[in-house]
From Swiss-Prot:
One of the Pfam families matching this protein, by short name: PSI_8
Known role: May help in the organization of the PsaL subunit.
Membrane topology per record: Single-pass membrane protein
Protein name per UniProt: Photosystem I reaction center subunit VIII
Main location: plastid
Gene coding for it: psaI
Keywords tagged on the record: Chloroplast, Membrane, Photosynthesis, Photosystem I, Plastid, Thylakoid, Transmembrane, Transmembrane helix
Entries under SUPFAM superfamilies matching the protein: Subunit VIII of photosystem I reaction centre, PsaI (SSF81540)
Length: 36
């Protein structure tokens, strides 16, 4: 019962979390480039 429910919860979580992590890494890269 857990296996079919897991992707239903995991896919939207990754869909929201992945762009957030990408934005954070991009912001840190811009900030680091600005310091240099």
């Amino acid at each position: 019962m857990i296996i079919p429910n897991l992707p239903s919860f995991f896919v939207p979580l990754v869909g929201l979390l992945l762009p957030a992590i990408t934005m954070v890494i991009f912001h840190l890269y811009i900030q680091n480039d600005d310091i240099f």
